[in-house]
Design a protein with these regions (language model features):
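Short acidic capping loops at alpha-helix termini that bridge into adjacent secondary structure
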Residues: 66-68
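Contiguous, often N-terminal, cationic amphipathic patches that form binding interfaces
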Residues: 1-52, 56, 70-76, 80-101
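The alpha-helix within a helix-turn-helix
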Residues: 59
Length: 101
């Protein structure tokens, strides 16, 4: 699962590819060799709406606050890297389970 990388203590980098203006919002199935996690969003990529929808989707899935997740690259691209910080220890496999459930 190359789309999720441990950056440091309780900090992960999540690589996603977004498809905007979709009928459904969600995380698409993935394989262990995927470099990107594919996510569909309902919003159009206008006035940062899709980025906000992406942040809200991820933070609800893994139950974190808004200040614990940031887009660090790809603000205006479909390929994005997000930095996720946790207050407590969480394993990589636990994080993936939360994202997929």
């Amino acid at each position: 699962m190359d789309f999720l990388e441990i950056k440091g203590n309780n900090t992960y980098l999540l690589r996603v590819k977004v498809k905007t203006n979709s009928i459904k919002q969600g995380i698409l199935p993935y394989s262990d060799t995927d470099s990107w996690l594919s996510i569909t969003l309902k919003s159009k990529p206008v006035k940062n709406k899709a980025n906000k929808e992406l942040i809200n989707l991820i933070k609800k899935k893994i139950n974190i606050a808004s200040d614990q997740i940031h887009i660090i690259s790809g603000m205006k691209k479909t390929s994005k890297t997000l930095e996720i910080k946790f207050n407590n220890n969480i394993g990589k496999s636990d994080l993936i389970k939360k994202l997929i459930d």
